Amino acid sequence: MTGSLSTQQVRHFEQHGYLCPLAGIPAAEAGDYAARLADYEERLGVEPQKYFKIKAHIAAPWMVELGRHSALVDAVESLIGPDILLFGASLFSKKAHDSRFVSWHQDSAYYGLDPHEEVTVWVALTESRRENGCLRVIPGSHRGPDLKHDETYDPENLLAR
């Protein structure tokens, strides 16, 4: 595999700490993964984030397949080189008009890695817009230290324990 990002995209990532939009997996494949997630939810009987917030790829092998998708791995390789490890995978099932949310956080605070050379790839399996709760970022926040994260215990917060 070779990195697929342009020099300009890599520079943007290094400066701002995020990169979007990025052509990810084709819509038909996203639909297949969304169907696998729905099947997984049905078999579990609960939403997967209840049990699999960080290591979902261990219980759901199709998550490993998704994590190895060449479109994603090629982009990551452009940012950190070819030595890539899938360290964690999270599943958040949030339907349209769902009042729940994911609170502001830094992914790096959950992994305890030092130095911070990890990359998070956020993959939406369905359409994601501001109106239905898309990912939001604070540009440049990757340059500072991990901030203190307060547990809210809010039942509407998908990150709550």
Kindly label every feature range from the protein language model:
Residues 86, 103, 120, 124, ...:
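Conserved beta-strand segments that form the floor/walls of ligand-binding pockets within enzyme
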Residues 27, 66, 115, 119, ...:
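Alpha-helix initiation and capping sites
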Residues 2, 18-20, 120-124, 134:
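Conserved hydrophobic/aromatic beta-strand scaffold that supports enzyme active sites
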